[in-house]
A protein has these predicted regions:
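Cytosolic eukaryotic protein kinase-like domains
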Residues: 1-29, 60-85, 96-143, 176-310
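Conserved beta3 strand of the Hanks-type protein kinase catalytic N-lobe
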Residues: 52-53, 65
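Conserved N-lobe loop of protein kinases adjacent to the ATP-binding glycine-rich P-loop
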Residues: 53-60
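Conserved N-lobe motifs of Hanks-type protein kinase catalytic domains
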Residues: 44, 90-93
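Protein kinase glycine-rich loop
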Residues: 38-49
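Protein kinase catalytic-loop region centered on the HRD/HxD motif
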Residues: 147-160
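Conserved alphaC helix of the protein kinase catalytic domain
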Residues: 39, 85-88
């Protein structure tokens, strides 16, 4: 029922339940008072997320599948198994950790590490949160997501495509480090397969080619990453700007025109240079032609070279 036997009990107190799924189940149900809404911290299309604190252990985020009187819907089961399949294959500091899962008719849920600051989307929507996300922090958020995607695309065999990179699926820790979450529609690319699928993801982040082809590739994530980077720079979704880019022959946009005006302009030349590079990378990731978009490995390499040169 639980995974990650390699982690020591001192590092992960949740592991004490590895061999006793019934105890784990009972403790979570008890701590959440049978998943009372007062512990709910988020609602998605297929699940609710609860903040659950187990006595003597740490705080966890528990994602509970929605169910009906007929049981769990087929689509929800698919999302559940997708998430388990993806997260049991990967380990990266910028990808949220799955500690365990339970699949039962009454309650089916996944147990993750809890991210104290919630989603990047919520932080950017809040005046106070946006100001707390200063320019240096935003640079680190972008790098964290880039490293996670590069790992998934280039270091996992076979590669894993997230398919729903958006600000609501980037979670922030207490020190505002970025973690990629929600692998419910992730796809593991199978060799010698067409990897065709139905369109899925968050409107406003979907690669344009998905309107005429069902083939999922790394380039779909890269387009979504481009949208996300502009959103981090601007402090809001860059919908109108992207539309203008697709219909314009020029991709030259002054940096000052895309920076969140809730923050004071950056004064450090190092930060200015990093923000300018991120703007440039985001525009290349948003190319209408998938083959023209860079790989995530290339994106990370350029970010690292910029940091080294400063």
């Amino acid at each position: 029922m639980l995974k990650d036997e390699s982690t020591s009990k001192s590092e992960n107190p949740f592991l004490i339940w590895y061999f006793d799924g019934e105890t784990m189940f009972e403790d979570i149900v008890e701590a959440s008072e049978n998943f009372d809404d007062k512990y709910c911290i988020g609602v998605g299309g297929t699940a609710k997320v609860y903040k659950v604190e187990i006595p003597g252990a740490q705080v966890f985020a528990v994602k509970k599948l929605r169910s009906t009187v007929e049981g769990i819907e087929t689509e929800n089961i698919k999302s559940f198994t997708n998430e388990v399949a993806a997260l049991t294959k990967i380990r990266h500091r910028n990808i949220v950790k799955l500690f365990g899962f339970c699949f039962q008719e009454e309650h089916s849920f996944l147990v993750y590490e809890f991210m104290e600051r919630g989603s990047l989307a919520d932080m950017l929507c809040s005046e106070e949160g946006a100001k707390e996300l200063d320019w240096a922090t935003r640079v680190q958020v972008v790098k964290g997501v880039a490293y996670a995607l590069s790992y998934m695309h280039c270091d996992c065999v076979p590669p894993i495509i997230h398919r729903d990179i958006s600000s609501k699926n980037i979670l922030l820790s207490s020190d505002l480090e970025a973690y990629v979450s929600d692998f419910g529609i992730a796809k593991i690319l199978k060799p010698n397969s067409s990897n065709w699928t139905t369109i899925a993801g968050t409107y406003g982040y979907l690669a344009p080619e998905l309107t005429y082809t069902m083939a999922v590739t790394e380039k779909c994530d890269i387009y979504s990453f481009g949208v996300l980077v502009l959103e981090v720079l601007m402090g809001k979704h860059p919908g109108e700007l992207i539309t203008n880019l697709h219909y314009s022959t020029s991709t030259s946009i002054p940096l000052k025109d895309v920076l969140d005006d809730r923050l004071s302009p950056p004064t450090s030349q190092k930060i200015v240079d990093e923000l300018a590079l991120m703007q440039s990378l985001s525009l290349s990731c948003l190319s209408a032609a998938p083959q023209s978009r860079p790989t995530m490995r290339s994106v990370c390499r350029q970010l690292e070279m910029q940091a080294a040169n400063n």
